[in-house]
């Protein structure tokens, strides 16, 4: 009987991909889903949006390449995860931010949060959100200076800052004067980070990812739904207040593109629902009772940290597993 040819199998370290989708394919779909929001951002805030995106994406890619080379690891630029991180970080920044600060946030997101823990699939918190939070703590003025949308179209106008809708709403569940119309809120004519204002574009991108089965609807729906329920109670039954809360801040960006990150979210349905509800609860409580007007970033980071515990509680036990009983002697001891 002739000998069978020996086939060498390469077994790599976890996490193992259990899908027909490749990492680069998944990331490419995320980039495609972000294009409507990017186009809306350029319309709202001008060509500087592209410059910020180029800086964050370029710095993320360079940081990943150099850090992995120094650590003598393989080049992973081809998986496009650094591009997605750079794009999402840019979406979390105001259009007026100095470019060098955007570059610092990119280095932190890639080197400190991602590569020091082993690279893609190993980080325990979302890199883009962590980069944003560190920039917010380090440069609070730059990170909270919001340029009025569409001002760039008036060539003779000087930069005019504006408040975000969340800072204009009272903590008592009431609407204040001067808020943009709900139509303006939908299309993004309001103060905010360059990629978070146009709710319609973000929803289109989120629906695309769900249709392509890149993300599960469990996290975004439970996240947004929890915020809606709490704000309905806080707003004393006012659906208008709920609508403003859902369309304000980074809720749509966070729910569809940040909380659904594969590495930092649960893998089973029950865990995802708990994760989304937790994000919604924390976001709502920070908005209603915290000193900061927005809580999406902080809520996602906190729930990222709890993911191992959520998975421990919600992962089904293998069939036939029986809980080991304590021996009588051990109980007396």
Which residues does each PLM region occupy?
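N-terminal signal-anchor module of multipass membrane proteins
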Residues: 1-61, 331-333
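Alpha-helical transmembrane segments in multi-pass membrane proteins
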Residues: 29-37, 52-64, 81-86, 90, ...
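Structural signature of hydrophobic alpha-helical transmembrane segments
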Residues: 46-59, 96-105, 185, 189-199, ...
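C-terminal ends of transmembrane helices
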Residues: 62-73, 110-122, 204-213, 256-265
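A generic, well-ordered mixed alpha/beta core segment in the N-terminal half of proteins
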Residues: 81-156
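Long hydrophobic alpha-helical segments that form multi-pass transmembrane helix bundles
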Residues: 122, 127-203
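Loop-to-transmembrane alpha-helix initiation sites
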Residues: 124, 128, 243-251, 272-274, ...
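A beta-strand-loop signature enriched in Asp, Gly, Thr, and Trp
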Residues: 220-222, 229-269
